[in-house]
Design a protein with these regions (language model features):
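Acyl-donor (CoA/ACP) binding surface of acyl/acetyltransferases
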Residues: 1-27, 64-176
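Conserved GNAT-fold acetyl-CoA-binding loop/helix
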Residues: 28-49
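Sparse recognition of residues in long alpha-helices and their boundaries
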Residues: 36-37, 60, 154
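A short helix-loop-beta-strand connector motif used in the catalytic cores of GNAT acetyltransferases and
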Residues: 50-62, 72
């Protein structure tokens, strides 16, 4: 578990699966910029059975508050095999909890953890240009804007440009 001031990041437990699948399939509550694809329940369960949503180059942690309520999740994954980077994906499940700094704390905890435990030089965020909340989050967490990837993301029936942000290992854990 990774503990912050107001949240804890913890692995997914078997007892979380029903709730987690309900959030996974609630497309209307995902927010405007979260991918719309869903897995079947057997495929979702199989993925959990294989590795508990935690592997060498990918993983998911739940975001838990002090009342032990699940607020959302954060994931990391290897982008492509020839780049020395991970990408983060995240979601706050309840619209009432959005905009309260939960994800800023979660991203900071995850970035610190990944750079302390993985031999990876950079972590990136891919953000829709209209997603002002995620752009602010990236900047608050020290990510640098690198530019626009034109037509790189397909969602809701069309291709979208995305903004690329990154943070480097030495930005977080300077070498002496």
């Amino acid at each position: 578990m990774l503990s912050g001031q107001s949240i804890t990041l913890r692995p997914v437990h078997a007892s979380d699966m029903e709730m987690l699948y309900d959030f996974h399939t609630d497309i209307q509550n995902r927010g405007e910029y979260f991918p719309r694809g869903i897995l079947s329940e057997p495929a979702f369960q199989k993925q959990f059975q294989e590795n508990g949503f935690w592997g060498k180059d990918d993983g998911m942690l739940l975001i838990i508050n002090s009342a032990n309520e699940t607020l959302g999740h954060i994931e990391f994954f290897k982008t492509v095999n020839y780049l020395d980077e991970y990408e983060l994906s995240y979601q706050v499940y309840s619209t009432e909890q959005r905009g309260k700094g939960i994800m800023t704390e979660a991203v900071n905890l995850m970035v610190q953890y990944l750079f302390e435990t993985k031999r990876m030089n950079r972590i990136r965020l891919i953000i829709h240009p209209d997603n002002a909340a995620s752009r602010r989050l990236a900047e608050k967490c020290g990510f640098q804007h690198e530019g626009t990837a034109r037509g790189a993301w397909y969602n809701k029936g069309r291709h979208h440009d995305v903004e690329v942000y990154s943070i480097l290992h030495d930005d977080v854990i300077p070498t002496s």
